[in-house]
Amino acid sequence: MEFEEGLNGRADKNFSKMGKKSKKEKEKKPAVGIFGMFRYADWLDKLCMALGTLAAIIHGTLLPLLMLVFGYMTDSFTPSRDPHSDRAITNQSEINSTHTVSDTSLEEDMAMYAYYYTGIGAGVLIVAYIQVSLWCLAAGRQIHKIRQKFFHAIMNQEIGWFDVNDAGELNTRLTDDVSKINDGIGDKLGMFFQSITTFSAGFIIGFISGWKLTLVILAVSPLIGLSSAMWAKVLTSFTNKELQAYAKAGAVAEEVLAAIRTVIAFGGQKKELERYNKNLEEAKRVGIKKAITANISIGIAYLLVYASYALAFWYGTSLVLSNEYSIGQVLTVFFSILLGTFSIGHLAPNIEAFANARGAAYEIFKIIDNEPSIDSFSTKGHKPDSIMGNLEFKNVYFNYPSRSEVKILKGLNLKVKSGQTVALVGNSGCGKSTTVQLLQRLYDPIEGEVSIDGQDIRTINVRYLREIIGVVSQEPVLFATTIAENIRYGRENVTMDEIEKAVKEANAYDFIMKLPHKFDTLVGERGAQLSGGQKQRIAIARALVRNPKILLLDEATSALDTESEAVVQAALDKAREGRTTIVIAHRLSTVRNADVIAGFDGGVIVEQGNHEELMKEKGIYFKLVMTQTRGNEIEPGNNAYESQSDTGASELTSEESKSPLIRRSIRRSIHRRQDQERRLSSKEDVDEDVPMVSFWQILKLNISEWPYLVVGVLCAVINGCIQPVFAIVFSKIVGVFSRDDDHETKQRNCNLFSLLFLVMGMISFVTYFFQGFTFGKAGEILTKRLRYMVFKSMLRQDISWFDDHKNTTGSLTTRLASDASNVKGAMGSRLAVVTQNVANLGTGIILSLVLVYGWQLTLLLVVIIPLIVLGGIIEMKLLSGQALKDKKELEISGKIATEAIENFRTVVSLTREQKFETMYAQSLQIPYRNALKKAHVFGITFAFTQAMIYFSYAACFRFGAYLVARELMTFENVMLVFSAVVFGAMAAGNTSSFAPDYAKAKVSASHIIGIIEKIPEIDSYSTEGLKPNWLEGNVKFNGVKFNYPTRPNIPVLQGLSFEVKKGQTLRLVGSSGCGKSTVVQLLERFYNPMAGTVFLDGKEIKQLNVQCVRALGIVSQEPILFDCSIAENIAYGDNSRVVSHEEIVRAAREANIHQFIDSLPEKYNTRVGDKGTQLSGGQKQRIAIARALVRQPHILLLDEATSALDTESEKVVQEALDKAREGRTCVVIAHRLSTIQNADLIVVIQNGQVKEHGTHQQLLAQKGIYFSMVQAGAKRS
């Protein structure tokens, strides 16, 4: 018992730790530690980062070093500029005075300094490349590992973890959050170290050149550092909240897109948009707060920087006037400190990126670090050489982690001997399926023990345990690959002969061989291209190929028609020979031959025995048998006919939403799913479908925020102009010492110019705040609008768009997560910086040409600057191509991840976690290789643009000396041109670092514009068409031909004609996959017929408004519920109004679910879990029926509406449905003939055509296909 308690305690601790957190905890959520961000760096990554950091440090040192050279050079100029100056020349000036102040001497000196500049530029070219490329390489390698580790961690979690955590958020984290980590730990960190070194080196050189002045300037620096630190802290907190809101929005989007048919059928688009928008609104609100806080900090930083300039020049000029320093010294100190402090400004985007990365990494690393109590990857545990198959449940108590207050099993005791077949029977939700889940160790019991061959299963290796068990569940999940691959999921390394043998045993061989691609046919996402019966048979083949010791059949034949069921049941009977088998079935005809039948009630077994024994006891089993047989003269079980002439083609294409709703709507193409071909087709699709957009088209997306953008641009222009104005003031201060003014005049002028610096600081504070706030707000509004518009456009599309292999849930949620934020990346604060830098350079050039007689030097610099810009353009072009490749390749990995996460229970049962990991890892190979290439491209182009600045220094001062020597320019004007143009060019060079963001934005904007402008053939938002006040319910199909868009060559309906009058009940019968559910989809107007016409009340369905057409009630075979309360799920039946609680309760009573709901602690407020996983199949089905009834529809569509119900529930629900269809037109699809015979009209469909029609008695008299079906049913009973 100690062993059990330890395990259970650990499980409880885990769930409480990983479950719902309190509000307080969320608010105080910390970020990952600085060094913790690099936890996945190996020795090579560390070497790359170390060398990259060393290169960044050298790079950061070279610019302040340049200022040292600049100081010496200034003192070379000063004597030639002001030979009659009475200023005492000290320090560097004394050295320079030893030179002959002649034109030749000046030019020779300047040539030497030009060589220094060129040498420093060459050094920058090398170290800048090493810095950027190595940091990008290290980041690319670490991100590759993080993606794999994160996916591994998800695959390693236990089912209980998914019950209490929103799986929908995981895909957003895999894309958006990992991208943020990549952004934060790559080249921006290299630039961070570069800026820090520039800051440090600047101050060191400042101290060496003039410690007094440096100390004065340094007095302001702690305040600047403090504001940066506070900003980073606040930013991390806001980023966490923003990411959380976006993750919630992403979870909503994934849930909605996964259930798109349910959403469209019930007209839930508006409701889902509001739900999505609510989370976006929260993210926008946090984002705007973040922008305000951040930009107050930036404004304060700039105010402090300019205040330090004012102080520096005021004190510096005093030192020059008192003959303590030369002007060269003051400039060396000033520029060194200036560069140091400006480098703090450049830290801002890098700190922001790293803060964002730390916030994003917190949740990811938390999941990676979560140790599951049931570890499917563990190598620990016993692996017996042989398994006999004796099973025992000893006093087992259990409740689900997400609903701990609801007890499911209350002391279950059950023994199953080796080779025995035990059938579990009982009402829906009594704990039968829970028993099967405990045996697979998907959960551990709260108390008690489950053992195999006398050994507690908790001591057996988890993977080994699951590999000896074969499972076929009520709602089987197939993966979006070929039929053969789906069966291979059952057991790796299985041969083709074994696959064929398994499908023959499962009665699937014939329909597979009739398909064009046979075993290589793609089944679509979640098996969407197959009918329910076909999916079930492939799932059975998958279980059989496993050759399991223990077989668990949870309603394994529920979706099959009579003939298929008989053959498959025989196959299962054969398969369970020599195996221990547990069968759960509602149809008692399938359990009567079991060795032991166990009757469940209230979470315990109340009776055990074989059929005859239990019939004598007249207990639960007897009651169920009598309920089922009463009134079923024809047969007590399931019937529907499958003709031998049935073509596999028509079977398959009834992709029919047999299940229309759970299977999730989005299907993949018929191309093979070999990785290479898939990638190739993806790339071709990109080239065809993504027209590139211009900057103006991207800007147009933000045009509604033009007042914000105008103010933002205006502020950015002012900020850009401040730098050239600074150049004028700076040159004037230098000029003060060139003129022969008296001491008092010089001091007065210096005081005035110093005060101007303070004024510039105040202006900067205001303009930086408004620039950041306006662009930040516009960017957040844009992100919200784009996500909303894209999601709205997705929900507008018709079902055929979702059928396209490019539009799976995974790729759509990936696009939603990344596209809007990518566009914002080019439009928000980055656009502000670009505008500012362009204004900076433009104003500098204009001032130099117009106000200064230095056009020759300006022109030289104007020739050099395009080279810097050219580097940026080349960089952008190259990176744009890489961004497009990355985007598509990561969409492929997103599809794989989504499929694995959504179908996690199936993946775990099949022990195929490692298979999905391998597939995911393979899908990451191309993005990984692209990231490594991109590192070098970015490194080369960045190094070029940076080095060109130094080369421009060399050219500027060499040519400046030439002009000064020939008296064509004054030194003051050389300084003005140099400061205005070169610093502007430096800003332009920095702009090129935004090239990757702009490249990504262009690709994303093209996708966004493409989907927003796409108008579907069947427009769910259309207000056009006739809107009759009342639909009577007359339905007519006239010569309807149809095939699914994904398989244009395979006909489904081939001239279908029938008519059903108002208030009549039409029953569609026929073989699995003959086109019955296609009729339902055409009535819902999910598709338009290829030929022929569908009429509603005598009007062609296309002429009616699409929302009016969809005012139908629908209950499908595998209903999808949303992760919200039971009340909200029922109310979802009618989204055109607010459904009252009384109506919800009434609908629940009619569907025989009220009593169960009322027994729950939270009653109608109980959450049902993702896709209703917290409920049994029967409970889900009854809630789906209540959802349809609350709509009070004129036409009711029932596609196997009672197939998942147990006998007792089915009888009551069938009565409710019979009552519900009074006065309504009903179209019913059912396999059980007991539910068919009372229909007003029975239509037998074969090969997409009506073969027989009439009442039950008329069709029996014809002795045709229907008669054969009845005979088959009679034999079975």
Curated annotation (Swiss-Prot):
Its EC number is 7.6.2.2, 7.6.2.1. Residues 391-627, 1035-1272 form the ABC transporter domain. Residues 633-660 are annotated as: Disordered. CDD domains: ABC_6TM_Pgp_ABCB1 (cd18558), ABC_6TM_Pgp_ABCB1_D2_like (cd18578), ABC_MTABC3_MDL1_MDL2 (cd03249). Keywords: ATP-binding, Cell membrane, Cytoplasm, Glycoprotein, Lipid transport, Membrane, Nucleotide-binding, Phosphoprotein, Repeat, Translocase, Transmembrane, Transmembrane helix, Transport. It comes from the Eukaryota. Residues 1-42, 137-185, 236-293, 352-709, 776-830, 875-934, 996-1277 are cytoplasmic. Residues 49-356, 709-1000 form the ABC transmembrane type-1 domain. Gene3D superfamilies: ABC transporter type 1, transmembrane domain, P-loop containing nucleotide triphosphate hydrolases. Glycans are attached at residues 91, 96. The modification Phosphoserine is found at residue 659. GO terms for molecular function: ABC-type xenobiotic transporter activity; ATP binding; ATP hydrolysis activity; ATPase-coupled transmembrane transporter activity; floppase activity; phosphatidylcholine floppase activity; xenobiotic transmembrane transporter activity. InterPro entries: AAA+_ATPase, ABC1_TM_dom, ABC1_TM_sf, ABC_transporter-like_ATP-bd, ABC_transporter-like_CS, P-loop_NTPase, Type_1_exporter. Pfam families: ABC_membrane, ABC_tran. Residues 66-115, 208-214, 316-329, 731-754, 854, 958-973 are extracellular. GO terms for cellular component: apical plasma membrane; external side of apical plasma membrane; Golgi membrane; intercellular canaliculus. It is found in: Cell membrane; Apical cell membrane; Cytoplasm. The modification Phosphotyrosine is found at residue 641. SMART domains: AAA. This is ATP-dependent translocase ABCB1. The gene is Abcb1.
